[in-house]
A protein has these predicted regions:
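C-terminal beta-strand-rich structural cap/linker in extracellular carbohydrate-active enzymes
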Residues: 29-31, 566-580
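Active-site-proximal helices and loops of the catalytic beta/alpha 8
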Residues: 235-243, 253, 258-269, 328, ...
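Carbohydrate-binding surface patches
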Residues: 24, 522-557
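Non-catalytic, glycine-rich low-complexity segments
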Residues: 1-33, 110-128, 133-135
Length: 580
């Protein structure tokens, strides 16, 4: 038995509360394992005396996920008294081994006279410890908007801007196009018709950049975008249409005109706000240049985005009060935390406690590009931007030698990182303002459509970057931040793309199993790059086929969504979604 491949700890994804009554236990094994039993019971089932002989009840575990080198076995328990003690019985072709908290034992060695068995325990299921992201997020279809580039809805005076909204050549990071909040309000019917139920806005606060990630004043809407009244109208109008609103917030760093930084610039280390930032040198050096010299910290090495000390209780209190105002006065439904893995855990815990007290259903999203387990324990973020999902999709289509098993391994790894309830609200996306446009990255319309189909048929809270529904193209920033081509949209130039996206969104809404956790994978030895998976439901199962080959494949089916499927033939690079 390959003992090195076996792993379990009684925490996070290995052992957690699914809800107020259920506990999920997972164990990772090698592929030589043929079965696993959980031996479990209440820790006090036989009394509390030190001389009792505790015996666990056997319960077969289910092989839930296959990874490249491992199996993940799982079981769901509903312990009567909300606590459980346990160990594992593992079977291979020729061995039976027991796993306790202190290691592996044979049946004989485990029962040696005088041995003190170290069992795993879930001590008690406390209601307040359950990871419980807002349930509504799992049913939400998000749409990400860069306000300056989405729609220009008013003619009030604004800083320099392109004369022609349709100008998309030679865009720089310093261009302004005049998009605003009123433009977003005007296009809410368009978003509702598309099937969108949540909008995520890039920062809207006072700043001198088009992206607003160097915030000058967290209390003022940038006048280029409109007024506080415009934002309130946007939120209220969106809510009337069944659309939630999430704001982007930057707490890792501020802009140079932020009042606290300006006070430091004027007074140096005598400023009462000196400890609001991560400054390493005294006396304070008043210069703007790369931060590679280490005089103070900032975002990357940018001197116009000085890093806030989010471990400072005064900083926590200030921004807690700011966000409290946003939630109470504006009625927003979520906050996205920029550079979310560089903000202190204590800051996030403070924000979670403060804001969830006001609105327990507030959605807190972190921008993190990596395994985010340490931020998703229930007292910080509800979800993160799921870059591992995005990257795994890209890597499969880049590697033409990868087969359907490799795709399964990649997706199963993504969904093994976090608890089930977190997987349901992971912020899945194909592109953002920080990446190439999806179509440009994919390099072909077929691959782009395949990835859209995956986005809308796997667990998570999918997000469409503005323009992805019309197959907008663009390289890395700033090319991925072009204006929305409303003239061409209204002329019907992108109807085919819009119809494709709308149909997938409608499908996701119609079939709840597409939002559930369970995925069953299938593989075809004759067509190794034919991706196929089931999404089982209570009444029926939905099956997804993605033909990533250059040949036609006969598949008789009851289709509910197709692309390049005719007369029971799934053509090369086609998509088939059907009931089985």
């Amino acid at each position: 038995m390959n003992l090195h491949a076996i792993a379990h700890r009684s925490l996070f994804t290995d052992c957690y509360a699914r809800n107020e009554r259920e506990i999920i236990l997972n164990i990772r094994t090698g592929k030589d394992i043929t079965g696993v039993n959980l031996l479990f019971d209440d820790p006090y089932a036989y009394g509390i005396s030190g001389d009792i002989h505790w015996i666990g009840r056997p319960l077969p575990m289910r092989m839930e996920r296959e990874l490249k080198h491992n199996y993940v076995y799982t079981v769901k328990l509903t312990p009567e008294y909300r606590r459980v003690q346990y160990c594992f019985e593992l079977f291979s072709a020729d061995e039976v081994i027991y796993l306790y908290e202190d290691g592996f034992y044979t049946a004989e060695s485990a029962e040696k006279k005088g041995r003190l068995k170290q069992y795993f325990k879930f001590p008690y299921l406390n209601k307040c410890d359950v990871i419980a992201p807002p349930a509504w997020a799992a049913d939400t279809i998000w749409y990400q908007i860069m306000p300056d580039r989405f729609c220009k809805g008013s003619d009030h005076p604004k800083r320099m801007q392109h004369k022609d909204w349709e100008d998309r050549e030679g865009i720089t990071g310093f261009d302004f196009f005049g998009g605003d909040l009123r433009g977003i309000i005007q296009k809410l019917p368009y978003l509702k018709d598309l099937g969108i139920t949540g909008i995520y806005l890039l920062p809207v606060f006072l700043s001198d950049t088009n992206h607003k990630y160097n915030t000058f004043d967290y209390t003022k809407i940038d006048p280029d975008f409109g007024t506080e009244e415009d934002l309130i109208e946007l939120v209220n109008t969106a809510h009337d249409m069944g659309i939630r609103v999430m704001l982007d917030a930057v707490f890792n760093h501020s802009g140079t005109e932020f009042f606290a930084w300006q006070d430091i610039w004027e007074k140096g280390e005598d400023s009462e706000f000196f400890d609001w930032f991560v400054i390493h040198r005294k006396p304070f050096e008043r210069k703007y240049a790369s931060l590679r010299d280490g005089r103070f910290d900032g975002f990357a090495f940018l001197d116009n985005m000085p890093k806030l000390d989010t471990g400072n209780p005064k900083v926590q209190k200030y921004f807690g009060d700011i966000c409290t105002y946003w939630v109470q006065k504006w009625g927003i439904d979520g906050i996205r935390f920029d550079v979310g893995n560089e903000v202190s855990h204590r800051f996030l815990q403070y924000m979670n406690r403060t804001l969830k007290t006001i609105n327990p259903e507030l959605f807190l999203l972190g921008e993190i590009w990596m395994d985010s387990a340490q931020w998703l324990r229930g007292d910080e973020y509800d979800s993160v931007m799921n870059y591992p999902f995005f990257e795994s999709l890209q890597n499969f289509w880049v590697d033409e030698d990868a087969d359907s098993r490799d795709f399964m391994y990649a997706m199963n790894r993504v969904y093994s990182l976090y608890p089930e309830q977190t997987n349901a609200v992971l912020f899945n996306h194909l592109d953002t303002h920080d990446t190439m446009r999806a179509l440009t990255r994919c390099g072909s319309l077929d691959i782009f459509y395949h990835q859209q189909a995956v986005l809308m048929t796997l667990p998570g809270s999918p997000c469409i970057y503005y323009g992805t529904e019309i197959a907008m193209e663009g390289g890395h920033d700033p090319d991925c931040r072009k204006t929305m081509p409303w003239r061409d949209i209204e002329a019907g130039k992108f109807t085919d793309h819009q119809t494709f996206t709308k149909a997938l969104i409608a499908l996701r809404k119609q079939y709840p199993q597409l939002r559930d956790e369970k995925i069953v994978w299938h593989h075809d030895a004759m067509n190794p790059r034919l991706v196929c998976y089931d999404r089982p439901g209570e009444q029926e199962t939905i099956r997804v086929y993605l033909n990533n080959t250059e040949k036609d494949i006969p598949i008789p089916a009851d289709p509910i969504f197709t692309y390049k499927y005719e007369n029971a033939i799934l053509k090369a690079n086609g998509i088939l979604i059907c009931r089985i």
